[in-house]
């Protein structure tokens, strides 16, 4: 039985350098060579998971098929490799200590003093080794930055694994910043040297150094890093900025990253087939048309909050050979300026389509409903996701059905609670979600059925509140069709407006299943509707 090899990806100097994209790109390259891979994320923070963390702190919460709330990097892993992540592919320090303390309370440690070494590090190693049978490579991204106190148990676990398995089964890729100083007009390698010394201090030596920078790093600078960091010149690889993340597998292949990984393990494989990636890059660089989609939300200053959403739009744009320009519209009041109908209209007047994404809390919801009303009354393609769908229902009930006191139980007590809580109110915040993949029945002859070319689908969910079934008849007799229902018929999963070019709201998150090689059918249909609108307008 073959034994998996382990690739560890660490980062130095600063965070947000793109370790997740490096791990994803390496996974894609190894797949192109014919290997079976899996990618995992080890996060040093003390939260159990990112489910209750602020989007401004952490960015998007990516939901897996089996209902885990995970780091947004798992979305990159899925999109680059096509492999569905699971709850076993993301661990946090908080989850580790939670498990450790449960074991201690059960008496599993038989009265021993419970310590970081060996007990925490043993749990980390168990997570890394779990479920690796039949795989060629397991890629593990270590969150945070080398030198952070929170990362030390993870680095110690990697050191122990490296010592036990040896170079024949372990490689360490270190991603580091090589900043450009405009005053000196040169790239500075000193931060990289210090970062590698931090690794050396905990007993680790990188095998490959990836140098992130604004521009290409010269051979002289690479040689300096190689000499001072004890890494061969061929393993010091320049990683300059790119215009789009899907250029990375092609770039890293050209830089020899995949080749160096295989040479480290003394493996020889045919030249990788990157035809698909090259086609994607070509489509992105040579769009035939440009359209503008407005995303109306309250975290528009933090685009990572909507990472999968933006990527799903990108995938559908690639498949339609167009470029999607995003117009970010904040739905909250700013600087004392009220967001009224005129204000929102001015923000949206140059948009070809409007999308209202998911979210929580009542902050900014009136602004979102103004955007929904604008799309509905002006026949502009509209896509509402999760909260976006719920607000579309409330706006419709207010302005079409003419209910006087209608809202969501999430925000207000009202006469017509058209949106209600799905489950038990007396549960911890992190335990009240409807999470993961659920089947949905689609009405034949609906726009939803046309988009999917199917009437039974499975989509990922992350929500507490649902459309109140008591109002289904009111909605439908006024023209808002409930075109998607849960398998058991208890949840309204999708609505669409009659006599509108494209007005669809869904309770689930289709963006989590979209990939560059298989764009999500709803996003493809949405963008096609946008293109058709532009043709009619310009024709």
Swiss-Prot record:
- Provide the binding site for UTP: 15, 188-193, 224
Q: Which PROSITE patterns match?
A: GATASE_TYPE_1
Protein's name according to its UniProt entry = CTP synthase
User: What SUPFAM superfamilies does UniProt report for this protein, alphabetically?
Assistant: Class I glutamine amidotransferase-like, P-loop containing nucleoside triphosphate hydrolases
Task: Please list which residues make up the signal peptide.
Answer: none
Reactions catalysed, semicolon-separated, are: UTP + L-glutamine + ATP + H2O = CTP + L-glutamate + ADP + phosphate + 2 H(+); L-glutamine + H2O = L-glutamate + NH4(+); UTP + NH4(+) + ATP = CTP + ADP + phosphate + 2 H(+)
**Domain spans labelled Glutamine amidotransferase type-1:** 292-536
State whether it acts alone or in a complex, and with which partners, per the record: Homotetramer.
What's one GO BP annotation on this UniProt entry?
'de novo' CTP biosynthetic process
Q: Which NCBIfam families match?
A: PRK05380.1, PyrG
Task: List GO molecular-function terms, semicolon-separated.
Answer: ATP binding; CTP synthase activity; glutaminase activity; identical protein binding; metal ion binding
Which residue ranges run through the membrane?
A: none
Give the EC class as a word.
ligase
Instruction: Tell me which residues bind ATP.
Output: 16-21, 73
Any further remark recorded for this protein? CTPSs have evolved a hybrid strategy for distinguishing between UTP and CTP. The overlapping regions of the product feedback inhibitory and substrate sites recognize a common feature in both compounds, the triphosphate moiety. To differentiate isosteric substrate and product pyrimidine rings, an additional pocket far from the expected kinase/ligase catalytic site, specifically recognizes the cytosine and ribose portions of the product inhibitor.
Q: How is its activity regulated?
A: Allosterically activated by GTP, when glutamine is the substrate; GTP has no effect on the reaction when ammonia is the substrate. The allosteric effector GTP functions by stabilizing the protein conformation that binds the tetrahedral intermediate(s) formed during glutamine hydrolysis. Inhibited by the product CTP, via allosteric rather than competitive inhibition.
